[in-house]
């Protein structure tokens, strides 16, 4: 497919505001792409808490956090062409496994989880997740989207 056009942008995610309707629309588009790929993915960190506890997003959240397993990263990168065609921008990429996407002034962080031990995954930053939580999931409905969330 060639090189993905990428222009690093200066942005301040701390000044971002998460709009409930617009973010749900963005989430729905990514949901369709990720499910088409058949990869292990899902909401993570504060986004997971908001979906389960509030059936929405946390009031102080300024982005949506999603995880993807390292072994699915190449398929995700191949799908980025279609995601960009749906109006998303890749506004930041870090080789440690962090992608920032933006659409309609909404920010999405995608964490690539690397296996660092038989039972532990790492985001490349300060966060660790037990493998068991990613494999033992619970079926969850969020605004018409059926997901398998970390148990």
Regions found by a protein language model. Name each.
Residues 1-44:
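Helical scaffold of the NTase/Pol beta-like nucleotidyltransferase catalytic core
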Residues 2-6, 24, 104-151:
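Catalytic cores of NTP-dependent nucleotidyl/adenyl transfer enzymes across multiple folds
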Residues 19-26, 67-101:
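Metal-dependent nucleotidyltransferase catalytic core
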Residues 31-64:
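Active-site nucleotide-donor binding segment shared across nucleotidyl transfer reactions
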Residues 47-50, 73-74, 97, 115-117, ...:
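Short, solvent-exposed loop/turn segments at secondary-structure junctions
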Residues 51-53, 93-98, 133:
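Alpha-helical scaffolding within the catalytic cores
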Residues 55-75, 144:
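Catalytic metal-binding acidic patch
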């Amino acid at each position: 497919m060639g090189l993905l056009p990428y222009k690093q942008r200066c942005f301040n995610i701390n000044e971002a505001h998460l709009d409930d309707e617009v973010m749900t629309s963005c989430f729905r588009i990514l949901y369709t792409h990720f499910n088409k790929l058949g990869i292990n993915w899902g909401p993570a960190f504060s986004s997971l808490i908001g979906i389960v506890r509030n059936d929405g997003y946390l009031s102080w959240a300024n982005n949506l956090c999603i995880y993807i397993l390292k072994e699915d990263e190449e398929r995700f990168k191949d799908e980025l062409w279609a995601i960009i065609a749906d109006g998303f921008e890749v506004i930041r990429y870090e080789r440690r496994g962090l992608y920032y996407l933006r659409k309609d002034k909404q920010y999405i962080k995608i964490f690539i989880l690397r296996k660092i031990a038989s039972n532990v995954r790492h985001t490349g930053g300060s966060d660790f997740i037990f493998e068991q939580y990613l494999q033992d999931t619970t079926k969850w409905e969020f605004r018409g989207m059926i997901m398998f969330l970390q148990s």
